[in-house]
Regions:
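Conserved non-cysteine loop/helix-boundary elements of the Radical SAM core domain that shape
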Residues: 1-121, 131-150
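Short glycine-enriched loops at secondary-structure junctions
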Residues: 125-130, 176
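Auxiliary Fe-S-binding modules of radical SAM enzymes
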Residues: 133-134, 140-225
Length: 225
């Protein structure tokens, strides 16, 4: 959002002002890049009702960010996060699993960094190979291996549980369904319209298996669904 021309940003925000004034809307949320954040601009959009800013961090590993050509670094994520928090705005940090040069260990480190940076919200997206992209070329040449559905579900379930334990709200798991991916655009990767439900099912399956394998026969557990 903050990468748009300032006039366009303001025009969008001005449309909402009457609704804010009447308490019909309590705040505005936007998503943007870490390298498109400045203290001055955050102050300005806060004045116009911005209450939540999500940053598309994707990873906090500089090697992963470089090879994915994200155009920002871990330091950019840290600086942008600090600016947002300094203005009392709720911080969200989005992450993506299965990126080139990524690993489950690096994914979990990204999750730890998201918690430590003070984010209160996150989104977990799996990396998908889309037609006519550089990632497709890497995939076709055997230089990139996409995550399977099962692997992505397993990783996402661990990340979700970690975020919940650390009071970080997970706003979404999995990509939005789109006509492009449903038709010719999809090449490879863990894309499924019910991806989030698969993750939650995996989490509950593990919880029940842990109960089943408990050493104490008289162990009583309350499970709230």
């Amino acid at each position: 959002f903050t990468g748009l021309p300032v006039k366009m940003q303001n025009d969008y925000l001005e449309i909402v002002q009457p609704y804010l004034d009447k308490n019909l809307v309590h705040g505005i949320r936007c998503s943007t890049r870490p390298d498109y954040i400045s203290l001055q601009r955050v102050k300005e959009i806060k004045h116009l009702g911005m209450r939540n800013i999500e940053l598309g961090a994707q990873s906090t590993n500089d090697k992963v960010l470089k090879h994915c050509k994200r155009g920002h670094t871990y330091d950019d994520i840290v600086e942008a996060s600090q600016i947002i928090l300094s203005e009392g705005i709720t911080l969200g940090l989005q992450m993506m699993i299965g990126l080139p040069y990524d690993s489950e260990e690096k994914d979990f480190q990204t999750a730890k960094d998201i918690v430590n940076l003070g984010a209160k919200e996150t989104r977990i997206y799996p990396c998908i190979v889309v037609k006519d992209t550089e990632l497709e070329a890497l995939y076709r040449n055997g230089d990139y291996k996409a995550l399977s559905i099962n692997e992505a579900v397993s990783r996402s379930s661990k990340l979700y549980s970690y975020f919940i334990e650390n009071q970080v709200k997970v706003l979404r798991i999995g990509l939005h369904q789109s006509d492009e991916l449903d038709k010719e655009g999809y090449v490879a990767g863990p894309y499924h319209k019910n991806f989030a439900e698969m993750v939650f099912s995996h989490i509950w399956k593990e919880k029940f298996e842990n109960l089943k394998n408990s050493e104490s026969e008289n162990l009583k557990k309350d499970i709230i669904i």
